Swiss-Prot record:
InterPro entries: ATP8_metazoa, ATPase_protein_8. The keyword Lyase does not apply. Belongs to the ATPase protein 8 family. This is ATP synthase F(0) complex subunit 8. It is a single-pass membrane protein. One of its GO terms (molecular function) is proton transmembrane transporter activity. GO terms for cellular component: mitochondrial membrane; proton-transporting ATP synthase complex. It is found in: Mitochondrion membrane. The gene is mt-atp8. The keyword Ion transport applies. It comes from Salvelinus alpinus. Residues 36-55 are annotated as: Disordered.
Amino acid sequence: MPQLNPAPWFAILVFSWLVFLTVIPPKVLGHIFTNEPTSQSTEKTKPEPWNWPWH
């Protein structure tokens, strides 16, 4: 049963992951994000009551 011999497919698996891990991260990390995240205030805002016309 050839699928039990790990020599051919294990080497292909390892080399393909090495290629993915050396090529993809620099491409992804090379992007420049145009929107800088802003910190939101931690104080809780008080909700404004609505003036509903109850008919």
